[in-house]
From Swiss-Prot:
Gene Ontology biological process terms from the UniProt entry: protein catabolic process; proteolysis
Any matching Pfam family: ClpS
Gene name of this polypeptide: clpS
Biological role stated in the UniProt entry: Involved in the modulation of the specificity of the ClpAP-mediated ATP-dependent protein degradation.
Source organism, top-level taxon: Bacteria
Phylogenetic placement of the source organism: Bacteria, Pseudomonadati, Campylobacterota, Epsilonproteobacteria, Campylobacterales
Protein family (similarity comment): Belongs to the ClpS family.
Name of this chain's protein: ATP-dependent Clp protease adapter protein ClpS
Subunit structure: Binds to the N-terminal domain of the chaperone ClpA.
Natural source organism: Campylobacter jejuni subsp. doylei (strain ATCC BAA-1458 / RM4099 / 269.97)
Length: 96
């Protein structure tokens, strides 16, 4: 007796990606925002300065695009660092 096997193919899809967005406020210093962008989002000084100016002029700016778990982790790091430095800086995560 012959046995046949059916192979089931699983279709893998790319994970959803999420934007981490910093929100401008009237208290957090530009230098602190640059520090956050360099330390948490690994931007060089030039890129961090550009992103900081975007946040300052537009009210918000995208710092990076990540999988959900990483985006939420970076959001928490931003909020924790801001609280530690007594700044009201906020970050939000949005699906791309």
């Amino acid at each position: 007796m012959l046995k046949t096997q059916t192979l089931e193919q699983t279709k893998l899809s790319e994970p959803k990606m999420y934007k981490v967005i910093l929100l401008n406020d009237d208290v957090t210093t530009m230098d602190f925002v640059i520090e956050i962008l360099m330390n948490i989002f690994h931007q060089n000084l030039e890129k961090a300065s550009q992103t900081m100016l975007e946040i300052h002029h537009n009210g918000s700016g995208i710092c990076g695009i990540y999988t959900q778990e990483i985006a939420l982790s970076k959001q928490k790091k931003v909020i924790d660092a801001a609280k530690l430095a007594n700044f009201p800086l906020q970050a939000k995560v949005e699906e791309e």
